[in-house]
Design a protein with these regions (language model features):
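C-terminal cap of thioredoxin/glutaredoxin-like
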Residues: 3, 16-32, 36, 111-211
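Aromatic-flanked redox-active Cys/Sec active sites in thiol-based oxidoreductases
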Residues: 5-11
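Surface-exposed, flexible loop/turn segments at secondary-structure boundaries
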Residues: 11, 42, 181
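Structural alpha/beta surface segment adjacent to cysteine/selenocysteine redox centers
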Residues: 15-114
Length: 211
């Protein structure tokens, strides 16, 4: 099974969905390849948002409490990082990690740094420390980001997501080309969605202008 996972590091639904997806695939025993597709909710120079003091967002995030409990994710909903960071550099770091065989580990580390440990993933120093934790050279990693080694690649990827895939929001998940819509992000729901790729519902996600 080929899975395309469109996401952003500051989207709480994305972390929960990725963990539910992994567990569901494990239970199904499906041979699946997951391709991550970057999508920036707040691309520069758009003004960053304060999710921490936004009561509407807090209320929306409550749907994640039960799946977080089931998946053993101690997430801060939302994390106390004000304003919410841009994610361009984090994605550039991901491309570096992919080139050095640590893409998946880096992805997991960035999500957890933001939503569990409340670290500012918009800062190169934070990203470099995460890179080192997954076995990458923090010095070369920092140099790559400062030199913009992956800036154009990241820009093209986000442009592709916006102009070709055109997701309503993130996460957007395609299984063998068919879009999955999720309501509550539980493992059970993900199992149902994967078993029937036509499964859909109203869905909850982070849109371009809100999350």
């Amino acid at each position: 099974m080929e899975i395309l996972f469109v996401s952003d590091y500051v989207c709480p639904y994305c972390l929960v969905a990725k963990e539910a997806l992994r567990r569901a695939l494990g239970k199904l025993g499906v041979d699946a390849h997951i391709t991550d597709q970057p999508y920036e909710l707040t691309p520069e120079p758009k003004e960053r948002v304060d999710t921490y003091h936004d009561q509407r967002r807090r209320a929306n995030y409550q749907i994640l409490e039960e799946p977080c409990r089931q998946l053993e994710l101690d997430m801060k909903l939302p994390p106390k990082i004000i304003p919410r960071p841009y994610t361009q550099l984090a994605f550039e770091g991901w491309y570096y990690a992919c080139d050095h065989g640590r893409g998946e580990e880096y992805n997991d580390s960035v999500y957890r740094a933001y939503f569990i440990r409340e670290q500012d993933i918009g800062e190169i120093t934070v990203l470099a420390a995460l890179a080192e934790q997954v076995g990458l050279d923090p010095g070369d990693f920092t140099k790559a980001l400062e030199e913009g080694r992956y800036t154009e690649k990241e820009r093209q990827a986000v442009q592709y997501a916006r102009e070709v895939l055109k997701p309503q929001g993130v996460p957007t998940i395609y299984a063998d080309g068919k879009k999955l819509s999720l309501n509550d992000y539980t493992e059970a729901e993900m199992l149902q969605a994967l078993n029937d790729a036509s499964f859909s519902g109203p869905g909850h996600f982070c849109g371009p202008d809100g999350c």
